[in-house]
From Swiss-Prot:
Organism annotation: Lactobacillus delbrueckii subsp. bulgaricus (strain ATCC 11842 / DSM 20081 / BCRC 10696 / JCM 1002 / NBRC 13953 / NCIMB 11778 / NCTC 12712 / WDCM 00102 / Lb 14)
Protein name as annotated: Ribonuclease Z
Any one Gene Ontology molecular-function term assigned to this protein's record: zinc ion binding
Function: Zinc phosphodiesterase, which displays some tRNA 3'-processing endonuclease activity. Probably involved in tRNA maturation, by removing a 3'-trailer from precursor tRNA.
Listed CDD domains: RNaseZ_ZiPD-like_MBL-fold
Annotated residues for binding of Zn(2+) 1: 63, 65, 141, 212
NCBIfam families in alphabetical order: PRK00055.1-3, RNase_Z
Residues the record marks as active site: 67
Co-factor binding comment: Binds 2 Zn(2+) ions.
Enzyme nomenclature, EC number: 3.1.26.11
The family this protein is said to belong to: Belongs to the RNase Z family.
Enzyme superclass (EC): hydrolase
Length: 309
């Protein structure tokens, strides 16, 4: 499981940062990549990575402002040129289906694969498949904006081969059943319960993505004990009033959330283009005074989400 930041700037692209997009790479787990937002030129950023468009199976859209969706038509069109790419699902606010279909219709773009749209209307579980769940809640922005919490199912503990050695279980189906915690009967009639030979279960990982919003209680519900919190930080600590007036967050508000929610690591994104050089360093310093495990993400940064334990 790996995060790759494709765009980390707010509002409009700068020379150093493109607008919002984040790839959650689940290649080892599902052989899939999930995208969170798709601002202008996201597919250009992807050309600078090892991401293949055919691997993108889900796109989660936080809200319908242009810096978060203008890259969709081009990316969807280019994905059609990749051959048999399989279906894709887009989760987003009311209006995202109309935006995509209108853009494709007016440009006479034909898509070679099915696209399913899931309109976000209320908070709750929106994905449950193959050991992963995604939850969403509404945030506090000028238009409907949604945050996302991805939860990986717990992993079974490792088979304790030393403990099992005395029973001389042969390689094959019986070992597989024991690894799954099932009961088996050996050739001599001995009955073994797989649960007796498994180490402690490994907690699944949690990744929370929060784009445009003011501080609001739903963020903390989504971020509770997340391994990784990706949180917008449009402004630094000195611009609290500006952040509130424009329905955005400061770096210290993101850090306060990370601290209160006991997250593993905080990645700041959606940063105003004004924060470069010493101003960017100052922003990180402000956040780290509250939550030391903070990183100001840059375009094309990659971060592995480690397993617990």
């Amino acid at each position: 499981m790996e995060l790759e930041f494709l765009g980390t700037c707010s509002g409009q692209p700068s020379k150093l940062r493109n607008v919002s997009s984040l790839a959650l790479k689940l290649l080892d787990e599902l052989n899939e990549i999930w995208l969170f937002d798709c601002g202008e030129a996201t597919q250009h950023q992807i050309l600078r990575t090892n991401i293949r468009l055919r691997k993108i199976t889900k796109i989660f859209i936080s809200h319908n402002h242009g810096d978060h969706i203008f890259g969709l038509p081009g990316l969807l069109s280019t994905r059609s040129f990749q051959g048999d790419v399989g279906p894709l699902t887009i989760y987003g606010p009311a209006g995202i289906e109309q935006f995509v279909k209108t853009s494709l219709r007016i440009s006479k773009t034909k898509i070679s694969y099915p696209i399913k749209f899931v309109t976000l209307e209320e908070g709750g579980k929106i994905v449950s498949e193959r050991g992963f769940e995604v939850y969403t809640e509404k945030l506090d922005h000028r238009i409907d904006s949604w945050g996302f919490r991805m939860v990986e199912a717990d992993k079974a503990g490792e088979l304790l081969m030393d403990k099992l050695a005395e029973f001389k279980v042969p390689n094959g189906p019986l070992l597989g059943k024991l690894k799954r915690g099932e009961q088996v009967e050996l050739a001599d009639g001995t009955v073994l319960n797989g649960k007796d030979f498994l180490g402690p279960a490994k907690k699944g990982r949690v990744v929370t993505v929060i784009y445009d919003t003011r501080s609001t209680p739903s963020i903390r519900r989504l971020a509770d004990h997340a391994d990784v919190l990706v949180h917008e930080a449009t402004f630094d600590a000195s611009e609290g009033k500006l952040a509130r007036d424009y329905y955005h967050s400061t770096c210290t508000q993101a850090a306060e959330t990370a601290s209160a929610c006991h997250v593993g690591h905080l990645y700041l994104t959606h940063v105003s283009a004004r924060y470069v050089g010493s101003l960017a360093s100052q922003m990180v310093k402000q956040a780290r005074e509250i939550f030391p495990a903070t990183t100001l993400a840059k375009d094309l940064d990659k971060f592995v989400v480690p397993m617990k334990g």
